[in-house]
Every structure is written in C-alpha cells, then in structure tokens.
Amino acid sequence: AVGTDYNRVNLLMAVLEKRMGVRMADCDAYVNVAGGMRVVEPALDLALVAALLSSYHNRSLQDGMLLFGEVGLVGEVRAVSQAERRVAEAIKTGYTVCVLPESNRASIENAGNLDTQKIKLIGVRHVRELLDCAGL
C-alpha cells in the first residue's frame, strides 16, 4: 500500500471476507494513492472497499462516481466530517454520483445548501449495499 495505511487495507479486506463472504485471503491487493499523496483519514475506507470489490469481481465502477465513508469492523458505513464540503467539491469537479454514509446523505439533503440536482447522492449503511449501488 503506497499512500495509505497498509494495516487499514488488511483490515478492510478482513471485513469483506468476514461480513460479505468475499474470499480475500487468496488475493494480493496493491493500493496506490495517485500523485504521491498520503491519505490516512478513515473517509477513504468506502472507496478502498469499492476498489477491492471492483478488482475481485473484475468489474469497473461507473464513470463519474465518488465514494467516501468510514467502514467499521462489522461492515457498517459510518458518517465522516466535512461531508457537505466533499460533495460540493465533487459537484465542482464534475462527479455525477456520490456514494456516502446514509446519515451524511440525509444531513446534506435536509440542510438544502447544495444543488443535489447536479449529483445523485446514494446513502449506504453497510458495505453490502455497494454491490447494488456501485454495480459490483
């Protein structure tokens, strides 16, 4: 793992195996954060899980999709800070779909500060939901 915590990647692979039955023990996982950056915040978890599932199932995520959220040991997707700001930046940079923790989605829509017509917000409570909403 380059640019992120190796132990966190292993933990997320263990969550996929235990909670979703995805056989990760036989797989090698290579993770690289582009641009030489180092990202250690838990909001990266959901995107890492989606990337691992994408590779495992040999299916690409849809174009224009952004994912963020912390993943817990039982596969629950936890809220992260600065969610509204993250979505605002996603809109500015042209993303069309954002998969995020359900509690963050509800807060953003209730606040009404963002034009949610420009981006589809998909709230998830558990990593299992990625299979449907991300096409995996």
Label each PLM-derived region with a short phrase.
Residues 2-136:
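Peripheral, non-AAA+ core regions of ATP-driven protein-machinery
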